[in-house]
Curated annotation (Swiss-Prot):
Belongs to the IspD/TarI cytidylyltransferase family. IspD subfamily. Catalyzes the formation of 4-diphosphocytidyl-2-C-methyl-D-erythritol from CTP and 2-C-methyl-D-erythritol 4-phosphate (MEP). GO terms for molecular function: 2-C-methyl-D-erythritol 4-phosphate cytidylyltransferase activity. The record marks 25, 32 as: Transition state stabilizer. This is 2-C-methyl-D-erythritol 4-phosphate cytidylyltransferase. The keyword NAD does not apply. Pathway: Isoprenoid biosynthesis; isopentenyl diphosphate biosynthesis via DXP pathway; isopentenyl diphosphate from 1-deoxy-D-xylulose 5-phosphate: step 2/6. PANTHER family: 2-C-METHYL-D-ERYTHRITOL 4-PHOSPHATE CYTIDYLYLTRANSFERASE, CHLOROPLASTIC. Pfam families: IspD. Its EC number is 2.7.7.60. It catalyses: 2-C-methyl-D-erythritol 4-phosphate + CTP + H(+) = 4-CDP-2-C-methyl-D-erythritol + diphosphate. It is an enzyme of class 2 (transferase). The record marks 170, 229 as: Positions MEP for the nucleophilic attack.
Length: 249
């Protein structure tokens, strides 16, 4: 894969906000990305962060199909000028990522795509910039932070209950965040191979590259603890506190 660009232009950068989930763990009848966080929906905050990044040329929103019209209304009222289209998501995370890829099929293979969870509304401009910068050298990047907790691997005993099988070295472990960034040629090839495999499923785009393009290095960008994923009701309270105290913007 060549990372060289024609001298007359830099790579175009598209960012896709993945908002196809239903947020069942939030215990809400509404998708979590449409819940309000300090006066704005979670979706708006994620979209606004990517729109504010000077490196990003275009933002695509991949939305839960049942709430597509609601998302269109919310984002139209917010005047997010970089949002070019809002498309329906798939039944799985990988299908929503594929929808994002299809939405930028007019981009060249050397252009860039950032895939970001809508449920991470506190992503910083520094993190977005770092992803784009690293993609001048490699074809895939993932944002991650060191684990402050010990992580164990479990198995089931004879009674069907979990027991510890191994304790991996914490120094070598990272907790993945988003955005995850790619040269479009890399992520296109990875997903083409993945979807050719019967029963393919994935929850992480870097993992798709790692599995289906093992020769392609996936570089780590050090993330920020404030870039939390709003999954449970308590996460919403934490996000509100981070905004209130100025730890996140």
């Amino acid at each position: 894969m060549s990372l060289d660009q024609p001298a007359h232009r830099r790579p175009r950068v598209a960012a896709a906000v993945l908002a196809g989930g239903v947020g069942s763990r939030m215990g809400s009848a509404h998708p979590k990305q449409l819940l309000r966080l300090a006066g704005q929906t979670i979706l708006e905050r994620s979209v606004a962060a990517l729109c504010a990044a000077p490196e990003v040329d275009e933002v695509v929103v991949v939305m839960n199909a049942a709430h597509l019209a609601e998302a269109e209304k919310i984002l139209a009222e917010g005047r997010y000028d970089k949002v070019s289209r809002i498309v329906p998501g798939g039944a799985s995370r990988s299908e929503s990522s594929l929808a994002a890829l299809q939405a930028v099929d007019d981009y060249d293979d050397n252009d860039l795509l950032l895939l970001h969870d809508a449920a991470r509304p506190l992503v910083s401009g520094r993190t977005i910039t770092a992803c784009v910068t690293e993609l001048t050298e490699v074809g895939a990047v993932g944002v991650a932070v060191p684990s402050s907790d010990t992580v164990v691997q479990v198995t089931l005993d004879a009674s069907g209950r979990e027991v510890i099988a191994a304790v991996p070295d914490r120094a070598a472990l990272r907790r993945m965040q988003t955005p995850q960034g790619f040269r479009l040629g890399v992520i296109r090839r990875a997903y083409a191979r993945a979807f050719a495999e019967p029963g393919f499923t994935a929850t992480d785009d870097c993992g798709v590259v790692l599995r289906y393009l093992p020769e392609e290095p996936v570089r780590i960008v050090t993330g920020e603890e404030s870039n939390i994923k709003v999954t449970h009701p308590s996460d919403l309270a934490v996000a509100e506190a981070l905004l209130r105290t100025g730890v996140a913007q």
